[in-house]
C-alpha cells in the first residue's frame, strides 16, 4: 500500500481548503448580486400588493413619507422605487460594515471554520427567507439577516492568509479578487435570466 508523504497530504488539504473558500465566497457573491436586476420589479410588486397584505400595512405610509423626501417634479412611482431600492442596498451594506469587526474578532477567538459555518448558514437562511417571502416585510427581514451574516467575506480573506505562505499571499488575494469579479458578473446575469423565465 502506497502511503502519501505527510508533506504532500498537507499540501493537498491546503489546496482543497482554498478551493472550498473560493467556492463559498463565489456562492455568497452570486447570491448577493443575483437580486440586483430583480429589485425594481420586486418593489413594484410589493408596493402594489401592500394594501392586501396585513403584514405590510405600514408600507404605504412609509412609501408616502419617502416620496415626500423627493423633489416635487421627481415623485413618480419609478423614482420612488429607485430610492427605496437604494435604501435597501444601504441597509444591507451598513449592517455588513457594522458586524464585520465582530465576526473577525469571533473568528480569532473560536477559529475561522465555526464562524464560516455560522455565517454561511445565516446567509443561506436569508436567501431562503427571501425566496419564500410573500410580503415586503419578510423581504426586508431577509436583507437585514443577510447583512448581519455577511461577515464571512472578511473571514474568508483571513483564512486564505492563514493558510498561504507569505511569498504566495499576493497571488492568493488576487484569486479572491477575481472571485469577487466573477460573482458580480454571474449573479446579475442569473437574476436577469430567472426574471425572464418567471422563476
Spans of features found by a protein language model:
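Residue-level signature of mid-helix packing/kink "hotspots" within the transmembrane helices
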Residues: 89, 93-101, 151, 184-185
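Conserved MFS/SLC helix-loop-helix module at the cytosolic interface between two early adjacent transmembrane helices
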Residues: 97-134
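Pair of pore-lining "gating" transmembrane helices in MFS-fold secondary transporters
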Residues: 15-61
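Extracellular/periplasmic helix-loop-helix junction of adjacent transmembrane segments
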Residues: 42-96
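Cytoplasmic helix-loop-helix junction between adjacent transmembrane helices
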Residues: 142-180
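Interfacial helix-cap and linker-helix signal at transmembrane-aqueous boundaries
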Residues: 43-44, 106-107, 190-198
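Hydrophobic core of transmembrane alpha-helices in multi-pass small-molecule transporters
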Residues: 26, 126, 137-151
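Glycine-rich segments within core transmembrane alpha-helices of 12-TM secondary carriers
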Residues: 173-191, 195
Amino acid at each position: 500500500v502506497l502511503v502519501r508523504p505527510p508533506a504532500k497530504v498537507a499540501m493537498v488539504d491546503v489546496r482543497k481548503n482554498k478551493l472550498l473558500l473560493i467556492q463559498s465566497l463565489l456562492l455568497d457573491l452570486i447570491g448577493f448580486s443575483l437580486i440586483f436586476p430583480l429589485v425594481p420589479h420586486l418593489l413594484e410588486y410589493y408596493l402594489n400588493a401592500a394594501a392586501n397584505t396585513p403584514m405590510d400595512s405600514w408600507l404605504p405610509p412609509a412609501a408616502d413619507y419617502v416620496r415626500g423626501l423627493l423633489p416635487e417634479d421627481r415623485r413618480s412611482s419609478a423614482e420612488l422605487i429607485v430610492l427605496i431600492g437604494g435604501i435597501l442596498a444601504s441597509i444591507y451594506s451598513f449592517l455588513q460594515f457594522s458586524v464585520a469587526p465582530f465576526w473577525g474578532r469571533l473568528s480569532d477567538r473560536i477559529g475561522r471554520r465555526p464562524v464560516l459555518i455560522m455565517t454561511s448558514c445565516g446567509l443561506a437562511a436569508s436567501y431562503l427567507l427571501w425566496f419564500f417571502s410573500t410580503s415586503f416585510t419578510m423581504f426586508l427581514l431577509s436583507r437585514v439577516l443577510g447583512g448581519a451574516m455577511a461577515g464571512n467575506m472578511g473571514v474568508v480573506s483571513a483564512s486564505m492568509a492563514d493558510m498561504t505562505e507569505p511569498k504566495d499571499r499576493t497571488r492568493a488575494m488576487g484569486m479572491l479578487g477575481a472571485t469577487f469579479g466573477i460573482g458580480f458578473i454571474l449573479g446579475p446575469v442569473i437574476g436577469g435570466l430567472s426574471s425572464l423565465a418567471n422563476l
